[in-house]
């Protein structure tokens, strides 16, 4: 649980800056949140915030449901895009360069194992999931292993010096899996949870809704781990574990789009204290994203109409987090500046 003992002291420091109360809006809330996190286990509230080694972890895996035509792209594109990430040619690479963030890809279960690469971490749970519309996507053992792998990954990242994490994902068919998870756990209507992903046709959209409904009917109202077994994805399961690992290491995560937010939601159902370490980057165009953000009482920093994934929204929001850190650290107080109000 996040120790809020220094909350008033932190807020006073923010309020004494040379600005009207609350004038920096959400940036003030970001600074306050980070200050609370970085003041954990301290004798007093931190007066200087720091961001060290901000890192994007892109969790990648394939989905059996993709063979049913629920996406504009075939499953082969998962592997192709992973290679694009590793070659530095994707949107996430461009944004990581502009924001000076590191990026690594985690192979959680792409159809084919990938050649070794310095920025590729192999944590394969299998060669893609089963078709969630017809049978359990994975075994209970794979769920438990995936959560454990995600936790251990974050422990290593934090112990190597990272103190701000961002998660992204890549997996053809994973909006179907995320929508099914959300519908099964929340009870929200299918039409609220299922969106058009990368831009499917009306016919594909109706098929996607029908297939997701079949999966949800097997696990509606079940426990989170059981829902993950029935309709989850290998990358989603590992992200759930990663969010739990971030809580264990008291490290904030800048949460990206729909799929990542659903993983965060699942993690909070398993361990409610996870919520204390989440910052929400943006609201995407995917139908269910706004709904799950509301369930998490989240206030995303951006609303840019994004629907790409990869962690792109999280990295774009990193600049705002840096700005929050800068004003907290260096903006003068009224007393320092000799300003009287």
UniProtKB/Swiss-Prot annotation:
Query: Which InterPro entries does the entry mention?
Result: Nict_dMeBzImd_PRibTrfase, Nict_dMeBzImd_PRibTrfase_bact, Nict_dMeBzImd_PRibTrfase_N, Nict_dMeBzImd_PRibTrfase_sf
Please name the top-level EC class of this enzyme. transferase
Record keywords: Transferase included?
A: yes
Give the coiled coil ranges: none
CDD domains, from UniProt?
A: DMB-PRT_CobT
| EC nos | 2.4.2.21
Recorded GO molecular functions are:
nicotinate-nucleotide-dimethylbenzimidazole phosphoribosyltransferase activity
Kindly give the HAMAP family that the UniProt entry links to this protein: CobT (MF_00230)
The name on file for this protein is Nicotinate-nucleotide--dimethylbenzimidazole phosphoribosyltransferase
What organism does the UniProt record list as the source? Vibrio cholerae serotype O1 (strain ATCC 39315 / El Tor Inaba N16961)
Q: Which gene encodes it?
A: cobT
